[in-house]
UniProtKB/Swiss-Prot annotation:
Purpose of the protein: Binds the lower part of the 30S subunit head. Binds mRNA in the 70S ribosome, positioning it for translation.
Any single GO BP term: translation
UniProt keyword annotations, A-Z: Ribonucleoprotein, Ribosomal protein, RNA-binding, rRNA-binding
Protein name: Small ribosomal subunit protein uS3
Lineage start: Bacteria, Pseudomonadati, Pseudomonadota, Betaproteobacteria, Burkholderiales
Gene3D superfamilies found in the cross-reference section: 3.30.300.20, Ribosomal protein S3, C-terminal domain
Organism listed in the record: Cupriavidus pinatubonensis (strain JMP 134 / LMG 1197)
Gene: rpsC
Region listing for Disordered, in residue ranges: 211-264
Length: 264
């Protein structure tokens, strides 16, 4: 199941959180969900060159709080904050409520799955060989601390007639383990031959809970010993030369033929 299901949805409430955090009743849910999708599509097109990894939308008390995670926050903010103000005004017009926009910087873009997928698709659109782009991204991710990475490309690779799928993996990518911190990203490259899809899985270690608390593994002794008797308590006759369990002076030697009882 872990091979097919979406890695983020599989780990919700275990080690991942929702990208849209709000509650609505049955009458308003569909409209708010459609609003979220339109806002994400708008930000994806508007901030195409800003290296946006993910967008979190929250709706507390007739307001909206949008957090944009980007590796290039200066591009989002603009000169003297002009671009961010225009962006906030457009979002308020679309959502109809006061909007607060927060910008969070991604410290290591080489290990962010969505940014890796976007980078590969941009290279494919520039007609760079897909194998070279995939292997370069894998090397950069492993060099900067990722414990495993898997990249899959599907479509008319290199312009061939029949579409195919190729993937490469380096390190460990435990998709079935719920406590594993798996970052997943997907992007599409629009080439002259058609659309090429790129999926990226990045394994960053094991975590427990949404606070990303690392798992502490205690070293285990491989030597398994059977529980012995307490020191100092020994059965009678054990460990002594010529002794047996019942003890006795002559118990350890075989009786000689001449040792028969008198009178026989």
């Amino acid at each position: 199941m872990g091979q097919k299901i979406h890695p983020t949805g599989f780990r919700l409430a275990v080690s991942r959180n929702w990208a849209s955090r709000w509650y609505a009743n049955n009458t308003k849910f569909a409209g708010m969900l459609k609003e979220d999708i339109e806002v994400r599509d708008f930000l994806k097109k508007k901030l195409k060159n800003a290296s946006v990894g993910r967008v979190v939308i929250e709706r507390p008390a007739r307001n909206a709080r949008i957090t944009i995670y980007s590796s290039r926050p200066g591009v989002v903010i603009g000169k003297k904050g002009e671009d961010i103000e225009l962006l906030k005004a457009e979002l308020q017009r679309r959502m109809g409520v006061p909007v607060h926009v927060n910008i969070e910087e991604i410290r290591k873009p080489e290990t962010d799955a969505q940014l890796i997928a976007d980078s590969i698709t941009q290279q494919l659109e520039r007609r760079i060989m897909f194998r070279r782009a995939m292997k370069r991204a894998m090397q950069n991710a492993m060099r900067l601390g990722a414990q495993g990475i898997k990249i899959m490309s599907s479509g008319r690779l290199n312009g061939i007639e029949i579409a195919r799928t190729e993937w490469y993996r380096e390190g460990r990518v435990p998709l079935h383990t719920l406590r594993a911190d798996i970052d997943y990203g997907f992007s599409e490259a629009e080439t002259t031959y058609g659309i090429i899809g790129v999926k990226v899985w990045v394994y960053k270690g094991d975590h427990l809970g949404r606070n990303d608390a690392p798992v502490v593994e205690e070293p285990q002794d491989d030597r398994r010993r059977r529980p012995g008797r307490p020191e100092g308590r020994r059965r009678e006759g054990e460990g002594r030369p010529g002794g047996n369990r019942r003890g006795g002076a002559g118990a350890g030697r075989r009786a000689a033929p001449g040792d028969a009882k008198s009178g026989e």
